[in-house]
């Protein structure tokens, strides 16, 4: 089986991609391998629990949020091809190599609310080309279609790397020698599914189309959908999307009525865009219920969006319900 270091040069050459772009991916992987070691030790290394501070999102930071964020920044800044970084945990962008060609955006530890109870978490990342001119916030505000690469590392029972350069999705598993080994090529998400993932405790806050959709699923084979569905909810986006990539399903984090100023909870640049590119490359769909996720023009680094992604039949149906 191919290791990442053997696979990557061939993949780049076959698809006429720059070697430096592959080098940025390897920097991300190096950082994630270090994060994986911290996650694995947990309480043994004293890295669990809260910091007592909050991030730009207004969320309480876990110790591992900060540790993972610092590892990503330090590792990526050491790569001269990286011009700048943007992190869910940082107020603004971070400048890097003066002559760098690439921008990297990331959620250093997605699902970190689960870390103290030993549930799967992960790192999500996106790579963009730096536009001409001085580095600024606007340099990062590109649509998801402009991503050169996207991926995630899942820290679960196995540590897995999943990424795409826009030429199919590839999955690697970390072995005992700390090498990522190719374990799945070009997975395809089934068009139809009987699984959905949503936080049902928020039902009273949802907009009517989402309430209708979930009611139809819960009605099962006697309802309008004519089949029984199972619900899943891990509260870790990386874990939810990985399951969908492996066997289908639909993941939803809809807008709700509590704060009209927030069109959703998840971040477009750090979470929704990279996951949408991966899923589209695997034959699935992703939207905010009104337009394809990858077509949304971002207005700020920390923009939030409603998220509906997974098996295309379900996402298409959700889009139709919202258009009525």
UniProtKB/Swiss-Prot annotation:
Keywords: Carbohydrate metabolism, Cytoplasm, Hydrolase, Magnesium, Metal-binding
UniProt key word Metal-binding: yes
The keyword Amino-acid biosynthesis appears for this protein: no
Residues engaged in binding Mg(2+) 2: 107, 110, 271
Positions that bind Mg(2+) 1: 88, 107, 109
Chain residues that bind substrate: 110-113, 199, 265
Single GO cellular component term: cytosol
Enzyme class label: hydrolase
Assembly and interaction partners: Homotetramer.
Protein name (record): Fructose-1,6-bisphosphatase class 1
Gene expressing this chain: fbp
């Amino acid at each position: 089986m191919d290791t990442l270091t053997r696979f990557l040069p061939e993949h780049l050459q076959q698809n006429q991609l720059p070697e430096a772009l592959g080098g940025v991916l390897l920097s991300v992987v190096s950082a994630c391998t270090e994060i994986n070691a911290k996650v694995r030790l947990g309480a043994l290394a004293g890295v669990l629990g809260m910091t007592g501070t909050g991030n730009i999102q207004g969320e309480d930071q876990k110790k591992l949020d900060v540790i993972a964020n610092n590892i990503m920044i330090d590792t990526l800044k050491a790569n001269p091809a990286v011009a700048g970084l943007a992190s869910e945990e940082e107020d603004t962008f971070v400048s890097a190599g003066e002559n760098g060609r690439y921008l990297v955006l990331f959620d250093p530890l997605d699902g970190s609310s689960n870390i103290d109870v030993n549930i799967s978490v992960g790192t999500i990342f996106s790579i963009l080309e730096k536009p001409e001119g001085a580095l600024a916030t606007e340099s990062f505000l590109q649509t998801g279609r402009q991503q050169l690469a996207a991926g995630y590392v899942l820290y679960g029972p196995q540590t897995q790397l999943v990424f795409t350069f826009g030429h199919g999705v590839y999955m690697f598993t970390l072995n005992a020698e700390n090498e990522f080994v190719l374990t799945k090529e070009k997975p395809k998400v089934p068009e139809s599914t009987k699984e959905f993932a949503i936080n049902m405790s928020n039902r009273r806050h949802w907009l009517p189309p989402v309430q209708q959709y979930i009611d139809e699923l819960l009605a099962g084979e006697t309802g309008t959908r004519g089949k029984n569905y199972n619900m899943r909810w891990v509260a870790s986006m990386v874990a939810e999307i990985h399951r969908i990539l492996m066997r289908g399903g639909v993941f939803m984090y809809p807008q709700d009525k509590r704060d009209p100023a927030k069109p959703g909870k998840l971040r477009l640049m750090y979470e929704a865009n990279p996951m949408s590119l991966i899923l589209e490359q695997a034959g699935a769909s992703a939207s905010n219920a009104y337009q394809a996720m990858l077509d949304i023009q971002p207005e700020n680094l920390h923009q939030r969006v409603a998220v509906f992604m997974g098996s295309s039949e379900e996402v298409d149906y959700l889009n139709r319900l919202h258009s009525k």
